[in-house]
């Protein structure tokens, strides 16, 4: 996916990977410190488990949990990380829960890109990184104000937003119908 996005033309991908590794190692060290504190209290070293390459957190940037899409606005030098979440609309806070999951999922990637962008020089200088999250409920629920705000951020003209939202809701309902047929 990353080769197709041309992110490497904007920011050196090796730098992004290096920053991600630093963030992941810092997180692991904090987790180990926390686990060590608990282990001392419990006197049970068997419960300490080190993370490895199969760690889902590590997959945020390198594996299956990559973002759904990436959009690049060359004029304003903005890199958009796009994530679409489909969640149960039975709870009133379905949108907030979906947004939290997406932020957590892409935290390392976004922070890595932001750090490398801040340190960039020459043609790579001046880029910003934004995570745009679209959340839809299982029954086609969409928070209109947030959805329109996201489309506005992406530069979609107001006259096109309702049609795009209707298409999004249609896709949500098709996905739900597919799930129900196979249950």
Which residues make up each language-model segment?
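Short amphipathic alpha-helices and their capping/turn residues within compact interaction modules
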Residues: 12, 16, 111, 115-118, ...
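Polar/charged alpha-helical tracts
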Residues: 22-25, 111, 118, 149
């Amino acid at each position: 996916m990353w080769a197709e996005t041309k992110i490497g033309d904007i920011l050196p991908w090796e730098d992004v990977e290096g920053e991600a590794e630093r963030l992941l190692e810092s997180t692991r060290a904090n987790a180990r410190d926390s686990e060590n504190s608990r282990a001392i209290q419990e006197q049970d070293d068997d419960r300490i488990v080190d993370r490895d390459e199969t760690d889902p957190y590590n997959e945020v940037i390198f594996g299956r949990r990559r973002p759904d899409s990436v959009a690049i606005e060359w004029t304003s030098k903005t890199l958009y990380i796009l994530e679409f979440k489909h969640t149960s609309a039975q709870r009133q806070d379905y949108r907030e829960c979906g947004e939290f999951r997406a932020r957590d999922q892409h935290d390392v990637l976004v922070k890595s890109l932001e750090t490398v962008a801040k340190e960039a020089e020459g043609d790579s200088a001046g880029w910003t990184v934004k995570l745009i999250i679209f959340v839809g409920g299982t029954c086609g629920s969409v928070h209109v104000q947030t959805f329109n705000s996201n489309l506005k951020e992406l530069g979609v003209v107001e006259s096109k937003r309702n049609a795009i939202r209707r298409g999004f809701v249609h896709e949500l309902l098709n996905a739900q119908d597919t799930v129900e047929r196979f249950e």
